[in-house]
Amino acid sequence: MAEGDLVVDRALEAGCEPVCALVDAGRPPAITERLLALAPVYAGGEQVRAMVTKLGVPNSVVAIFHRPRRATVEEIAATARRLVLVEAVDNPANIGAIIRNAAGLGWDGLIVDATSADPLARRSLRVSMGHALVLPHARTADAAATVARLAGDGFTIAALTPDPTAVDLDDVEPPDRLVVCMGAERVGLSDDVLAASTLRIRIPMQHGVDSLNVAAATAIACWALRPR
């Protein structure tokens, strides 16, 4: 489900096939004409749209799309220089924010493990502002095995951790091909992923704060280690 004209527009630009759409009956958005050429479009007032979408303030357009084919890890890694891998990040809003951060800062793709939220879940898609349909993403059943395989393919694997013995992010010279691994808040990355990593890095913190929200930490890491 894509909500809002920006997200619906990005879905269409990404080649996604709409099933149907619901638009504001009083003020149909400009994108309505494009949707009419592709799928049934229904119109409803704010009360109807709120009932259908369960949003207190519904968007002017909501569209259902066929789910696009998900890429494989191998397909994404083949041409990538910068990848984010997340483990056990089960909040769809965090996944959406991570996607938007990675896309906006020039990274090439996202890998999520089996316990992380779906990048195309309704909330992930909304928070990413539709970039979940633009940034390639893949799912892996075994994050540690994937990390080990990517290391064998020439990627430097950087595990972000609050561990005080890790290398400060400021002191890291960005390598040519890099995977940054992010874990769930409080729990962090699993021992297996940490063991498979080639580098452990930390964001220097102050005032007794040990770590940041995973999406905020991803944004900082993606900026500091962006491709040059």
State what each model feature region is.
Residues 1-56:
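N-terminal positively charged helical leader segments and presequences
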Residues 26-27, 46-48, 115-117, 140, ...:
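Short, acidic/turn-prone active-site loops that include or flank metal/cofactor-
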Residues 158-209:
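Active-site/ligand-binding-proximal alpha/beta "capping" segment
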Residues 63-65, 101-105, 119, 123-132, ...:
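Structured adenosyl-cofactor binding patch, chiefly the S-adenosyl-L-methionine
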Residues 41, 69-70, 75-165:
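RNA substrate-binding interface of SAM-dependent RNA methyltransferases
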Residues 60-70:
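Short, structured interface segments
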